[in-house]
């Protein structure tokens, strides 16, 4: 439990995520809020993401004697206290002076996976240190865009590995940023945007690769020694190709609805990806998750971990590391209640609740 938890972080209060978002909007610079909330083109994928989780229906179990649930689990063999994690976002030093350092500390305090954007405003070594200062066993991954110039990309991957990253989440849905009707460059006057290049000594490392292939996964692991998770998958056939290329995990994601608009929601895409992957790799999901019930729905459809993107940034803006911890713990408390009501003692037991049982 977070000491002196913020008033909005109360799982008994209906609509607390919207309250948190409203508080964040009050304190964030207007261009940062617009950037954070933007969806690609018409925002259809972004807007449908939230409703898609609410449309999932559950078949709870009874008479299983589960008692109080335990939300602990593992991601790629690393222990976490909750299946709820923090998805990568950039520009965090515009949100809060401590940026990713506060995000890392808050996630570590909650025992949650933290995925760090390659466009972080702090050095990976600083982020890893901030997490370990709270929990020596804190689990964090690097999210990476692979540049076509491997000579430039390799130092970034190795720096993250040296700083304690446990995996590389390779984003594959972004050959270039999709069009968003977000702030114009002049709207950012007075804000230092150079922060999001803290880990790029070579500017070539920030370029996006427009021709990624399966063999790039093996190169990443060979270069930095870390397992590779493929982020940005919504198709079952692509999920199979990821596994066959050596991916340790497949991350169902639409980039927060910020790439190809009208892409299917992650809640809709998840079951087929899980079925295609089987037990050959772990499956994760993000996109529109706003409550512990949403997390349960994702677990029921087969996700190992559930990542949230915008809400942690809202919490960071409002209350720094304390806010991030409070957000994650509140979602986990909601999940624990939902697990017990669904007849599940642990998160992995929720798989299958999203479909009627076979007799």
PLM regions and their residue ranges:
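Alpha/beta enzyme core
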Residues: 105, 126, 130, 134-137, ...
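Charged C-terminal helix
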Residues: 333-359
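Short, basic, glycine/proline-bearing loop/turn elements
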Residues: 85-91, 139-145, 203
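C-terminal structured "cap/appendage" subdomains that terminate the fold
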Residues: 305, 313-316, 320-331
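Conserved active-site and cofactor/substrate-binding residues in soluble primary-metabolism enzymes
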Residues: 15, 40, 44-48, 102, ...
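Glycine-centered helix-coil hinge/cap
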Residues: 29, 278, 319-320
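An N-cap/entry alpha-helix motif that binds or orients negatively charged groups
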Residues: 2-80, 180, 187-212, 348-350, ...
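Glycine-rich active-site/cofactor-binding loop and its immediate structural neighborhood
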Residues: 81-125
């Amino acid at each position: 439990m977070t000491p002196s938890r913020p008033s909005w972080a109360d799982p008994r209060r209906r609509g607390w995520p919207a309250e948190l978002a409203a508080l964040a909007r009050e304190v964030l610079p207007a261009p940062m809020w617009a950037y954070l909330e933007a969806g690609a083109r018409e925002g259809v994928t972004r807007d449908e993401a939230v409703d898609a989780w609410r449309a999932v229906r559950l078949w709870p179990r009874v008479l299983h004697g589960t008692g109080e649930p335990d939300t602990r689990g593992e991601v790629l063999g690393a222990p976490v206290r909750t299946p709820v994690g923090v998805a990568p976002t950039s520009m965090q030093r515009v949100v809060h002076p401590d940026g990713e350092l506060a995000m890392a500390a808050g996630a570590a305090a909650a025992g949650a996976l933290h995925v760090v954007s390659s466009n972080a405003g702090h050095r990976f070594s600083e982020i890893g240190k901030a997490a370990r200062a709270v929990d020596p066993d804190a689990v964090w991954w690097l999210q990476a865009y692979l540049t076509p110039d491997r000579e430039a990309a390799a130092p970034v991957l190795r720096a993250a590995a040296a700083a304690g990253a446990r995996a590389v989440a390779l984003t594959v849905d972004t050959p270039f940023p999709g069009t968003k009707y977000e702030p114009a460059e002049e709207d950012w006057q007075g804000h230092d945007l150079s922060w999001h290049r803290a880990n790029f000594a070579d500017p070539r490392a920030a370029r996006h690769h427009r021709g990624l292939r399966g063999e790039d996964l093996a190169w990443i692991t060979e270069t930095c020694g870390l397992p590779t998770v493929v982020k940005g998958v919504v198709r079952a056939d692509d999920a199979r190709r990821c596994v066959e290329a050596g991916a340790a995990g497949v991350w169902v994601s639409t980039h927060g609805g910020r790439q190809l608009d009208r892409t299917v929601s992650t809640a809709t895409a998840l079951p087929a990806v899980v079925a295609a992957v089987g037990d050959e790799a772990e499956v994760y999901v993000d996109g529109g998750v706003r409550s512990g019930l949403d997390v349960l729905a994702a677990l029921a459809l087969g996700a190992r971990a559930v990542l949230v993107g915008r809400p942690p940034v809202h919490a960071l803006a409002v209350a720094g590391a304390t806010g991030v911890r409070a957000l994650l713990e509140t979602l986990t408390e909601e999940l624990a209640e939902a697990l017990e009501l669904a007849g599940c003692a642990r998160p992995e037991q929720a798989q299958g609740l999203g479909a009627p049982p076979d007799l």
